């Protein structure tokens, strides 16, 4: 069978592109190597409990019925409703550095007031930076790369405030160490500080299942356990894909969410040479299940971004895990109408992917246990001690990410160099997802939609 478009990967970007194309009656097939959907944002069941992977919160929160903003645009493009996502807002989050704490909510004025109180000498420059952000066209697909640190330092002179602003933005959306492209900085600043966090009561599985159901209702074909081994081409155009089992599927266009380096490795011999280095920003995450709600222990923040050093370090650590900084997320601390079934504390820290990939199997589990203990030791400097209430634990590493997503190095935010317009050396092979450049859950979905609109609905 020949399709109008074959999509590689059933993550957020691939599913969203599939829905957009199928709505316009394109014949679309989504191919997913793994046994479940979601890619970097997925879910699993372990010891009779449900776990989310990837999702701490959905950024770009907006109240139902809002006409402006990325989330409203996303729902319109997918022909979905606010009820399909069922987002509940965060309560409050914090950025914690030595001797300084900034709170923020989904009301941007709260963050502005916090900056003014903690950094009175910097507030005028901060307001000018906010104006610069408002005027910047971050979604221009032909944009040039500009250092965000260079731009921000033109407005803010205090390095502590600079690092406190960068900390959540980098943790939730930077593929590059130590700095960000200014356009990506603008996207993340707006999505986290201007709009804020939300989460479905049922977690990421709700959104994924709604997308799949919508895609199939429009006539789309979704195949699991259908990994792509090779992209065949002739005269500069992709002609078909070959699956791991040898099946060949023809298509007029191919859209890949597998990553730039991963996709270009699939192109059969004789393809035009192009450089695509995989990223190496990856994480270890500790997930603790509690016998009580975190609020019962005095922890009410939704997310805490912390650094124990006045200078924030965002890069691949030389140690297996960077214990100097991290993210503490409690899925319980959103404004739900009823409590979750159990308490959760998720702690995420930068990790060295090469260490975790190369561990012998007989050392891997012990190493996970060791670093889980050390990660929690670091986290309880910033939240109440909770270990006596832990009833179950799971830990994932860059090795886990590599196994279940196929992303080289277990990288979460893709390659440092993005293919912003989605074009590859083959005229009808396009990229969406992390290596196109829109990151996060809403960003990934908009990436799929944007590339579908630009290249596949002509």
Report the location of each language-model feature.
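Mid-domain catalytic core of redox enzymes
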Residues: 229-339
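Short beta-strand to alpha-helix junction loop
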Residues: 62, 66, 143-148, 191-213, ...
